[in-house]
Each structure stands twice: as structure tokens, then as C-alpha cells.
């Protein structure tokens, strides 16, 4: 998976600069991002603090790992069911 280009702190700084009255286009150009990224960040992170964003990203990563674990265990379970069924 591709690593995020912007940290939580950078995203929050961009959001706060625009909230402070600067133009989206100017802030995005200065920070190397796109206007589309800004609007995605605004809808996802608007009103959050840096610690909230970090906690949310940690939970998203944990959720991804748990889903992978669940898929692996489900596959193991199906294989074991087939083995038991063949032995009976």
C-alpha cells in the first residue's frame, strides 16, 4: 500500500490556513497538494484535532489488520471443516 504523502499535522495545517481566510488554491499550491485533496481532507477531517486524526488512522490500520486476520481464520476454518468431513 502506498504511504500517505501528508502527515496528520500537515493536513491539519492546510485545513486551518484555509479556515483562516486564505484561498484553497494558494494553500494547496504552497503545500504541494491538490484542491481535490483539500476537499477530501475537509470532508474527512474537518473539525478534528491532530490527535483525533492520528487516533482515527490508527483505528483504520487496526481494522484493516483485523479484517485480514478474519479472512485468514475463515479460510483455515473452511479447510479444517473439509478435512474433518473427509475423515468421517
Curated annotation (Swiss-Prot):
The keyword Transmembrane does not apply. Keywords: Plasmid. Pfam families: HTH_Tnp_1. SUPFAM superfamilies: Homeodomain-like (SSF46689). InterPro entries: Homeodomain-like_sf, Transposase_8, Transposase_8_domain. The keyword Metal-binding does not apply. One of its GO terms (molecular function) is transposase activity. It comes from the Bacteria. One of its GO terms (biological process) is DNA transposition. Belongs to the transposase 8 family. PANTHER family: LOW CALCIUM RESPONSE LOCUS PROTEIN S. This is Low calcium response locus protein S. It comes from Yersinia pestis. The gene is lcrS.
Amino acid at each position: 500500500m502506498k504511504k500517505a504523502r501528508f502527515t496528520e499535522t500537515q493536513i491539519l495545517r492546510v485545513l486551518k490556513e484555509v479556515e483562516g481566510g486564505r484561498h484553497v488554491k494558494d494553500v494547496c499550491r504552497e503545500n504541494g497538494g491538490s484542491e481535490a485533496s483539500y476537499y477530501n481532507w475537509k470532508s474527512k477531517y474537518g473539525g478534528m484535532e491532530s490527535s483525533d486524526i492520528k487516533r482515527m488512522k490508527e483505528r483504520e490500520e487496526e481494522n484493516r489488520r483485523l479484517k485480514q486476520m478474519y479472512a485468514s481464520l475463515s479460510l483455515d476454518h473452511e479447510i479444517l471443516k473439509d478435512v474433518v468431513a473427509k475423515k468421517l
